[in-house]
Swiss-Prot record:
The gene is hprK. It comes from Clostridium kluyveri (strain ATCC 8527 / DSM 555 / NBRC 12016 / NCIMB 10680 / K1). It is an enzyme of class 2 (transferase). Its EC number is 2.7.11.-, 2.7.4.-. This is HPr kinase/phosphorylase. It catalyses: [HPr protein]-L-serine + ATP = [HPr protein]-O-phospho-L-serine + ADP + H(+); [HPr protein]-O-phospho-L-serine + phosphate + H(+) = [HPr protein]-L-serine + diphosphate.
Length: 308
């Protein structure tokens, strides 16, 4: 993924003071404040980043003699960069504009103060530049846990999601889930076209927000647990104690995965609710039901006079 300065102008509503010749792709979410460059130091200059000129940099330039300021700015604008953004609505110096126009560099402006704008810009770039993929499944918010329900087509993922929605949980995406990895966290959302919709075989497409209210649909959710629905296999050795832990790799992030075999009479919605509650409990406690059972066995052995 990449972003251009024109994307930033549009999405962050920036004022264009001077239009540059090149529209360079931005591939990093970090920014640079060119105070050192204005002083003439160009070692380790990160000119591939968006440049931010705030009150400190502006005041530094303002304190210079015009001839020196012109010299320093001509040197600065000789280097190509995606664009320079002036914050606080500051008016660029005459030498600043002349050098930018001469070298055909992008100069933009925002009325935001530097700190707030930098946070906003870096968050924007983090999202835009994050690694992403599209997965087949249903993403639900169950008890505050983002659960990705996977399984082969026709196994009942959407029907299970519909039952969960009836029980008060929220839909994020059905059938196609767009996933981005931001700082090791997987964030899932729905493609725009299918947002708020569920496809149920035999009924067609259902508008969840229209039938169950806007609160039944969530725009985005971090993925904490993957539940894979599969047909019951007689010879499969399913985990009965919760000791064996399996993970699914999504964009190089391991996510806890549970296999739920489907069999007549099993209430999948209730099982998924229990899985979500159990996962949430595991985040705050290291004690598992197996630990509790082991302690009880030890207690019974002691009562019977055995300590082994």
């Amino acid at each position: 993924m990449s972003v251009t300065i024109e994307d930033i102008i549009k999405d962050l509503e920036l004022e264009v003071i001077n239009k540059g010749k090149n529209v360079n792709e931005i591939n990093v979410s970090d920014i640079n404040r060119p105070g050192l460059q204005f002083s003439g130091f160009y070692n380790y200059y990160a000119n591939e980043r968006v440049q931010i000129v705030g009150k400190a940099e502006w005041s530094f330039l303002d304190a210079m003699q015009p001839d020196l300021r012109k010299k320093r700015l001509e040197k600065y604008f000789e280097f190509d960069n995606p664009g320079t953004i002036v914050t606080r609505g500051l008016i660029p110096h005459k030498e600043f504009l002349e050098s930018a126009i001469k070298n055909k560099r992008w100069i933009l402006r925002t009325n935001n103060i530097s700190t707030r704008f930098i946070n906003r810009l870096m968050n924007y770039l983090d999202v835009k530049l994050a690694p992403e993929t599209r997965l087949h499944g249903v993403l639900m918010d169950v008890y505050g846990i983002g659960i990705l329900i996977t399984g082969e087509s026709g196994i009942g993922k959407s029907e299970t999601a519909l039952e969960l929605i009836k029980r008060g949980h929220r839909l994020v995406a059905d059938d196609a889930v767009d996933v981005k990895q931001i700082d090791g966290v997987l964030n899932g959302t729905s493609p725009y076209i299918t947002s708020g919709m569920i496809e149920v075989r035999g009924m067609g497409i259902i508008d969840i927000s229209a039938l169950y209210g806007l609160s039944s649909v969530l725009k985005t959710k971090n993925i904490g647990l993957v539940i894979c629905l599969e047909q019951w296999k007689k010879d499969e050795n399913y985990d009965r104690l919760g000791i064996d832990k399996e993970y699914m790799d999504i964009l190089n992030v391991p996510v806890r995965k549970l296999k739920i075999p489907i069999r007549p009479g099993r209430n999948l919605a209730v099982i998924i609710e229990a899985a979500a509650a159990n996962y949430r409990y595991s985040l705050v406690s290291d004690v598992t039901p197996v630990d509790v059972i082991s302690e009880r066995i030890q207690e019974l052995r002691k009562e019977d006079g055995g300590d082994e």
